[in-house]
Amino acid sequence: MSVRRTRKDDGSQWTVADSRSVYGIRHWGAGYFAINEAGRVEVRPNGPDSSPIDLYEQVDNLRKSGLSLPLLVRFPDILQDRVRQLTGAFDSNIARLEYQSQYTALYPIKVNQQEAVVENIIATQNVSIGLEAGSKPELMAVLALAPKGGTIVCNGYKDREFIRLALMGQKLGHNVFIVIEKESEVELVIEEAAELKVAPQVGLRVRLSSLASSKWADTGGEKSKFGLSAAQLLSVVERFRKAGLDQGIRLLHFHMGSQIANLADYQHGFKEAIRYYGELRKLGLPVDYIDVGGGLGVDYDGTHSRNASSINYDMDDYAGVVVGMLKEFCDAQSLPHPHIFSESGRSLTAHHAMLVVQVTDVEKHNDEVPKIADKESLPETVQWLVDLLGPTDIEMVTETYWRATHYMSDIATQYADGKISLAEKALGEQCYFAVCRRLYNSLKARQRSHRQVLDELNDKLADKYICNFSVFQSLPDTWAIGQVLPILPLHRLDEEPVRRAVLQDLTCDSDGKIKQYVDEQSIETSMPVHSLNEGEDYLLGIFLVGAYQEILGDMHNLFGDTDSVNIYQNPDGSVYHAGIETHDTIEDMLRYVHLSPEELMTHYRDKVASAKITPRERTYFLDALRLGLTRSSYLSS
């Protein structure tokens, strides 16, 4: 283990408490993740009062058992704890406000359809939990996995077969709601209900005018892909009334968007939504359920703010708004209190999964002070940079930086114009980065005049840590929508991270890197890291990847699924592993794009046979090619 380093600002010894602050784990960890006194990340799957699990130790054991990196690690116990927290928040507010109905949490399986995820959520004891499906494949899964009598809500665009399957689910004993998203679905429901001789339970999705501020705001508001306008709503009601099925309209549904950061935005939209409830009741419809959709967010960056990757509220605040506003409206209008559904899939699943990656290589600027024998022989601009390598008064730190940057710009121009040589340009660059490194060590984050330069140098001096994973396969939201995910080393957190780095993946794509990082209470373009120790793997954990990432991942450069494992905790604190799945092989990935490994081997044999190589080489080449098809698409770890 490396020698502990001292903090640059005040000279005191670095402690684990400093790492907790720098990586913000207390803020985004939600009581599940922490740093122990040994400087390692630990997880408490059943909440902050449960027994800790040393993540670095677990990953080491899993690697020794044959699993390889990158590794997706799931903690199904966290799923059940999240369900208990969410239902507990609603139940406590229902009791506190004397609300005269109940709450059921709906899990929309589009968030993560993995069997272990769905089964662990619905297996949570002593809670009311249902499932939501938005496509025929999802509905087929839900019909099998939902407990008998369980609630199933059917959203999304529907054809005749979708509606028939939903009605079959109702006849099989499930509490099924078919939510009308567009007018053309009405006749299909009427016809299929008559064919199956079942009275359908119908929900109506309204398209709100209100729009929340979030990365997914387009899923709500007037431009939403789904939902009925006011005129369409009245038309749908009338068509069901003419068919004699209007008394089956029992649910009102709306959706304002995912990851709503500001609770005030939600309150504004909810005020509009509950007006629809009142109007539908006035039309004589027996609406007694309201599905408030998604929106309950996750504090990814730990700032507890209205940033796009944060939220300025918690589960209890959210439940209090929903229950409180509904009760106030219903009491004022003398209306019954409806049963509440919410589709809080992101909040239920985000925390339960993390990705472990290994740093395989480092690229850094040469910021060592060069040895210069004859300064006078150098171009004038390079000489000026050499002069800046000497001591600088603290008052002149920022001015020295701006001068050095100006000189470096001149050097780049002179090289392009053919006025200086490649060697002279390289020396100028080394001098420039040596000046920047020296100035960086003199800057004080607490001094306002230093902050702009400090931010620029954090970018310029950041190393490139090449990591054994694919952003596109494992963290698609980080490149697609700029999602921020917390990242930190799993070990060495009792040492100061003296470098900064940008994490880059293995793909041949300029977007194959992580561009934003949680750094204390802010978002930065690089992250604090440790220098690598020779002979020791440096492992990073990327957290809160349990929602959407696994299912949205793609195969860019033919990087496939990673190894994965579910870690469970026994009541005595011990752990066991289940659901182990190994990585996609190169052969698997080639088959995905309809390249036959058998045909490829035939081509290999033909080329080896016609090549001017020795018999021994032929055997070696064919064995290597055959073995290569069975290997992981990632680098060997």
Curated annotation (Swiss-Prot):
Keywords of this entry: Decarboxylase, Lyase, Magnesium, Metal-binding, Polyamine biosynthesis, Pyridoxal phosphate, Spermidine biosynthesis
Organism per entry: Pseudomonas syringae pv. tomato (strain ATCC BAA-871 / DC3000)
Biological-process GO terms, alphabetical: arginine catabolic process; putrescine biosynthetic process from arginine; spermidine biosynthetic process
Stated role: Catalyzes the biosynthesis of agmatine from arginine.
Residues reported to bind substrate: I290, D291, V292, G293, G294, G295, L296, G297, V298, D299, Y300
Pfam families for the chain: Arg_decarb_HB, Arg_decarbox_C, Orn_Arg_deC_N
Enzyme class: lyase
Modified residues (N6-(pyridoxal phosphate)lysine): K110
PROSITE patterns: ODR_DC_2_2
Magnesium among keywords: yes
A GO MF label: arginine decarboxylase activity
Names of the cofactor(s): Mg(2+); pyridoxal 5'-phosphate
Name listed for the protein in its UniProt record: Biosynthetic arginine decarboxylase
Catalytic activity: L-arginine + H(+) = agmatine + CO2
Family: Belongs to the Orn/Lys/Arg decarboxylase class-II family. SpeA subfamily.
InterPro entries listed in its UniProt record: Ala_racemase/Decarboxylase_C (IPR009006), Arg_decarb_HB (IPR040634), Arg_decarbox_C (IPR041128), Arg_decrbxlase (IPR002985), De-COase2_CS (IPR022657), De-COase2_N (IPR022644), Orn/DAP/Arg_de-COase (IPR000183), PLP-binding_barrel (IPR029066)
EC number per UniProt: 4.1.1.19
Top-level division of the source organism's lineage: Bacteria
Cross-referenced Gene3D superfamilies: 1.10.287.3440, 1.20.58.930, Alanine racemase, Lyase, Ornithine Decarboxylase, Chain A, domain 1
